[in-house]
Regions:
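N-terminal DNA-binding recognition helix of tyrosine site-specific recombinases/integrases
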Residues: 9-43, 93
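Alpha-helix N-cap/helix-start motif at helix boundaries, enriched for small hydrophobics
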Residues: 24, 96-99, 229
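Basic, Lys/Arg- and aromatic-enriched nucleic-acid-binding interface segment
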Residues: 39-95, 99
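Conserved tyrosine-mediated DNA breakage-rejoining catalytic core shared by Y-recombinases
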Residues: 46, 100-136, 151-152
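Catalytic-site neighborhood detector that most strongly recognizes the C-terminal catalytic loop/helix
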Residues: 58, 115-119, 233-258
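Short, basic (Lys/Arg/His-rich) helix/loop patches that form interaction surfaces
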Residues: 69-75, 190-231
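Short, polar N-cap/turn motifs at the start of nucleic acid-interacting alpha helices
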Residues: 104-110, 203-204, 224-243, 271-279
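C-terminal secondary-structure termini that scaffold catalytic or DNA-interacting sites
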Residues: 142, 148-176, 258-284
Length: 284
């Protein structure tokens, strides 16, 4: 299927490709039901829809503190760090949503925006470190809220890449050029995060997906219900959230099993007078 191959070439993950194809199939099926498309010719018949478990992407508190507290000179590396932390502070806001965020989306102490991927409206409280980042770049990147959709201005600096065009065709071309610039800038920021990871001596390279997974994992560790985490991330179902957290849940189960079965290799526990030691299951 050409569209699927196009999405893969764009670098989208298997899960994201499956998401877009399933939405397209739903539109096609509705068109068939309402008589806008012929029956008996299903273009999705040979397309296999699958969802992969994501590898561990969350980072621990030590890494977060190291990244947030790193003393960096003004420049692109500091911008990349600020964008990573902004995503964490915004409940794991997706990079594409940060790119298109505008000052009008900021109302007092909250950010109100709609996820570009699923159209889900979200409201995020602005905490002090997030406010500091927004204030730092507000004037530089207006009419955007964060310095992602930027392009060199030919004078040694950068300017926002705004959509232009006086007619629909011209505006459409400009939007396509803007999106291409977004993809190029996303690649640049990922390279900067890899460089920052090496500089800080991190075991794994940071990515913006890590910020999203980290928020979800920390929330789950704090005992926040799955339904709340799912809504906070803007997922349309808890199934997607569970993909994020499967590895964390598996680790908690392993820890529980270690506690339950620890008597096998603890001779002291076999004595009648021995009291159970270690963590309680309720503490996991």
């Amino acid at each position: 299927m050409e569209f699927r191959d196009h999405l893969v070439r764009e670098g989208l993950s298997v899960n994201t490709v499956t998401f877009y194809l399933s939405k397209l199939r739903a539109v096609y099926n509705r068109a068939v039901r309402e008589g806008f498309a012929p029956k008996g010719t299903d273009p999705f018949e040979s397309v296999h829809f699958r969802v992969e478990k994501t590898r561990k992407l969350a980072v621990d508190d030590t890494v977060l503190r190291s990244v947030a507290g790193a003393e960096l000179p003004r420049g692109s590396l500091a911008v990349a760090r600020d964008l990573f932390m902004a995503s964490v502070y915004c409940r794991g806001m997706a990079f594409v949503d940060m790119a298109y965020l505008r000052p009008r989306d900021i109302e007092g102490d909250v950010i109100r925006y709609r996820r570009r991927k699923v159209g889900q409206p979200l409201t995020v409280k602005i905490i002090p470190p997030l406010r500091a980042i927004l204030d730092r770049y507000g004037e530089i990147c207006s009419p955007f809220a964060l310095p992602i959709l930027m392009v060199r201005d030919g004078k040694g600096g950068f300017r926002p890449f705004e959509v232009s065009g006086s007619d629909p065709a011209g505006k459409r071309r400009s939007e396509q050029e803007q999106y291409k610039q977004y993809l190029d800038n996303r690649s640049d920021f990922l390279r900067l995060l890899r460089r920052l990871s090496r500089q800080l001596g991190l075991e794994r390279n940071l990515t913006f997906n890590m910020a999203r997974h980290t928020w979800a994992s920390r929330a789950r560790r704090e005992g926040i219900p799955m339904a709340v985490i799912s809504e906070a991330l803007g997922h349309t179902s808890e199934k997607t959230t569970r993909i994020y957290l499967d590895e964390l849940e598996a680790r908690r189960i392993d820890e529980a099993n270690d506690i339950v079965t620890s008597f096998w290799d603890d001779a002291e526990r076999k004595k009648p007078s021995s009291a159970p030691a270690g963590k309680r299951l309720s503490e996991l």
